[in-house]
Amino acid sequence: MSVIAGVFGALPPHRYSQSEITDSFVEFPGLKEHEEIIRRLHAAAKVNGRHLVLPLQQYPSLTDFGDANEIFIEKAVDLGVEALLGALDDANLRPSDIDMIATATVTGVAVPSLDARIAGRLGLRPDVRRMPLFGLGCVAGAAGVARLRDYLRGAPDDVAVLVSVELCSLTYPAVKPTVSSLVGTALFGDGAAAVVAVGDRRAEQVRAGGPDILDSRSSLYPDSLHIMGWDVGSHGLRLRLSPDLTNLIERYLANDVTTFLDAHRLTKDDIGAWVSHPGGPKVIDAVATSLALPPEALELTWRSLGEIGNLSSASILHILRDTIEKRPPSGSAGLMLAMGPGFCTELVLLRWR
């Protein structure tokens, strides 16, 4: 068993209302003639505002992938360090306590990876184990928590951390007037989050408040590579998003959740807290419909989408933090649930302390 000891979310300082972002986008080169559909998609996203890593007026001139990626590396390390220090403080631990660091991102390329750069900035021990996760996209927050558990099962005295940083706005140089690209401009924001987890023996020493990470399950769906991902070129990273995404959720998700819970002699009625990635309005509705959830079950998911947009892998960790702050009843079960490129689902079973 592993225990979550701290969670912290970090957001860049530049915050704009959805209407401000929309007004800026319609002035991007080549997008003015698509103003009607841009405004319609942005209005339908149910996003009230987003944080961006750059001032809004700088984006129209950011046309080179290399320039955008240099900004990504600098700002991602800054935000990642902020998130990790916050989570360590929440756990009453220090950077020198970290035995393993995992990082998750899909919105920029860094070699050496973000974990090496964050380790250098914070002075992590030279024997720290590193696990960079790239390409998982929106599922990486839940999958990263699952991988912390996998590691700590064999290292019950250790401290393992996950740092997720997504600067989705830096993919704007690749935006073209396709439905996928324009949906992305309506939903995605910038942000980071970190989780500190400890093995069961270390949990007793630091009096970790939980929740416990009990189990996880991954599901990779057949013939679904086309559903979501990046089209990568000299333009940078351009979003690929199939309208079949919600159909795939409705086809597979209920059975995935039911069989996973069955293995623990649980049902959906036993889940007191649903920690679900926000995706977008259609994704949230598909999850709720597939699992026959009452409206209040995904209230924190809807709230996160409205307040900060979709932060890709970092979103579910912000929602995890918000859920912990609500203090679910001791002994009750929680379920983390996210989906991403592959196409795939990651489920993580929690138990509140």
From Swiss-Prot:
Source domain of life: Bacteria
Swiss-Prot/TrEMBL catalytic activity: methylmalonyl-CoA + hexadecanoyl-CoA + malonyl-CoA + 2 H(+) = 4-hydroxy-5-methyl-6-pentadecylpyran-2-one + 2 CO2 + 3 CoA; methylmalonyl-CoA + octadecanoyl-CoA + malonyl-CoA + 2 H(+) = 4-hydroxy-5-methyl-6-heptadecylpyran-2-one + 2 CO2 + 3 CoA; hexanoyl-CoA + 2 malonyl-CoA + 2 H(+) = 4-hydroxy-6-pentylpyran-2-one + 2 CO2 + 3 CoA; dodecanoyl-CoA + 2 malonyl-CoA + 2 H(+) = 4-hydroxy-6-undecylpyran-2-one + 2 CO2 + 3 CoA
GO cellular component annotations of the record: polyketide synthase complex
One record GO biological process: chalcone biosynthetic process
Pathway annotation from the record: Lipid metabolism; fatty acid biosynthesis
Residues noted as binding substrate in the record, renumbered to the chain: 180, 241, 277-282, 312
Keyword list, A-Z: Acyltransferase, Fatty acid metabolism, Lipid metabolism, Transferase
Entry keyword Repressor: no
InterPro entries per record: Chalcone/stilbene_synt_C, Chalcone/stilbene_synt_N, Polyketide_synthase_type-III, Thiolase-like
Keyword Membrane among UniProt keywords: no
Known EC number: 2.3.1.-
Annotated active site: 138
Family stated for the protein in its record: Belongs to the thiolase-like superfamily. Chalcone/stilbene synthases family.
Physiological role: Involved in the biosynthesis of methyl-branched alkylpyrones. Pks11 catalyzes the extension of medium- and long-chain aliphatic acyl-CoA substrates by using malonyl-CoA and methylmalonyl-CoA as extender molecules to synthesize polyketide products. Palmitoyl-CoA or a similar long chain fatty acid derivative is the likely substrate in vivo.
Protein's recorded name: Methyl-branched alkylpyrone synthesis polyketide synthase-like Pks11
